[in-house]
């Protein structure tokens, strides 16, 4: 009998290949494995309802194949209160939030963790995230996933060492192609299912159409960097820094004749500011200020620290100097100017392969 046979692990089953293989691997390792499918969104149209129903069907098929029980739970109320309302408030304030990070914090590693422990008697939970956990100096740290292309530590920086200690990440030290190969070898229905992309509650819908249902758009003018009126926008919330498509001013050939890009937003005047050329100087910043800091070890760096930072997912690590102030703000100075650093997104800090934590970008330093 396996030494793990008395340890109960509840796997978050999404209906995707990563959680499917996670459940399979844990079963192979002798754990007592059960699945839990979370419903986080009350669908408002048939397409989204079908997508969620398909995911549940796939999760059930995988659990049946593996011979494990699948539980379901509805966290739609928690999701609305803690993730969706934050998402809307950030857009209303002119920032560009990352709801996946908030979902991990409030749902997967709070509501799910508590439900699994209290209602299902879990010793551990497990997810299909591409990160690794290691015990260093009596504390768990979160390391990047072995597959650089799939590493998801950026989305999990709000976890603490206690969360990591209670969670298993079975695919964290496996490359994605190998995960798919295992799924195919085991004849799991999800082996060739495409990875989900975009914001889960929007799905395949047009972002603009979705947002319009919840936030009234405030049209305004588009100005170039010299203050000239060059067009009109339908709402600042539809635009992000560095954006080229959807500006509806493509026919203008003024200035250099290069394409127009969003370089700034003037929230007070409700003005979208654009410049020509993908490397327009206004797109670059020398650093950033971040708030709502969270450190995995719950202590964090003190004073001035050399480390690396990511200001968006899949970005290469940027060398920087990090200064954490007494006021709970982080001031980050890049070694080289960086493009399209966006308030509302997260800045996540690393010491080599270890994710230290991060915060929300409040403003940029020009």
UniProtKB/Swiss-Prot annotation:
Residues under site feature: Interaction with tRNA: 129, 345
EC number: 2.8.1.13
SUPFAM superfamilies: Adenine nucleotide alpha hydrolases-like
GO annotation terms (biological process): tRNA wobble position uridine thiolation
Signal peptide: none
EC class: transferase
Record-linked CDD domains: MnmA_TRMU-like (cd01998)
Gene Ontology MF annotations: ATP binding; tRNA binding; tRNA-uridine 2-sulfurtransferase activity
Protein's cellular compartments: Cytoplasm
Region (Interaction with target base in tRNA): 98-100
Start and end residues of each stretch annotated as Interaction with tRNA: 150-152, 312-313
NCBIfam families tied to this protein: PRK00143.1, trmU
PANTHER family: MITOCHONDRIAL TRNA-SPECIFIC 2-THIOURIDYLASE 1, TRNA 5-METHYLAMINOMETHYL-2-THIOURIDYLATE -METHYLTRANSFERASE
Family indicated by similarity: Belongs to the MnmA/TRMU family.
Record-given protein name: tRNA-specific 2-thiouridylase MnmA
Organism: Pseudoalteromonas translucida (strain TAC 125)
């Amino acid at each position: 009998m396996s030494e793990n046979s008395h340890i109960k692990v509840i796997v978050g089953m999404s209906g995707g290949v990563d959680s499917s293989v996670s459940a399979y691997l844990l079963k192979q390792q002798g754990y007592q494995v059960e699945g839990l499918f979370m419903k986080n969104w009350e669908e408002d149209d048939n397409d989204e309802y079908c997508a969620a129903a398909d995911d549940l069907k796939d999760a059930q098929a995988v659990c049946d194949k593996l011979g494990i029980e699948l539980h379901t739970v509805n966290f739609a109320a928690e999701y609305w209160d803690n993730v969706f309302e934050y998402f809307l408030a950030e857009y209303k304030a002119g920032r560009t939030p990352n709801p996946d990070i908030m979902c991990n914090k409030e749902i997967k590693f709070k509501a799910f963790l508590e439900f699994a422990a209290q209602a299902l008697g879990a010793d551990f939970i497990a997810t299909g995230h591409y990160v690794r956990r290691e015990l260093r100096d009596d504390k768990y740290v979160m390391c990047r996933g072995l597959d650089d292309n799939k590493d998801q530590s950026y989305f999990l920086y709000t976890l603490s060492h206690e969360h990591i200690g209670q969670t298993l990440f079975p695919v964290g030290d496996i490359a994605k192609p190998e995960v798919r190969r295992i799924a195919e070898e085991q004849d799991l229905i999800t082996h060739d299912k495409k990875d989900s992309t975009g914001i889960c509650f929007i799905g395949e819908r047009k972002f603009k159409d979705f947002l319009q249902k919840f936030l009234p758009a405030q049209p305004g003018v588009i100005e170039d960097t010299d203050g000239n009126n060059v067009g009109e926008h339908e709402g600042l919330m539809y635009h992000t820094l560095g954006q080229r498509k959807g500006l509806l001013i493509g026919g203008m050939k003024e200035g250099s004749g290069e394409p127009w890009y969003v370089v700034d937003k003037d929230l007070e005047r409700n003005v979208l500011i654009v410049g020509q050329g993908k490397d327009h100087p206004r797109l670059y910043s020398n650093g950033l200020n971040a708030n709502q800091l969270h450190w995995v070890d719950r202590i964090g760096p003190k004073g001035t620290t050399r480390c690396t930072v990511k200001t968006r997912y899949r970005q290469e690590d940027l060398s920087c100097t990090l200064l954490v102030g007494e006021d709970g703000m982080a001031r980050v100075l890049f070694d080289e100017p960086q493009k399209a650093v966006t308030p509302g997104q997260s800045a996540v800090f690393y010491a080599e392969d270890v994710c230290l934590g991060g915060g929300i970008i409040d403003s940029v330093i020009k």
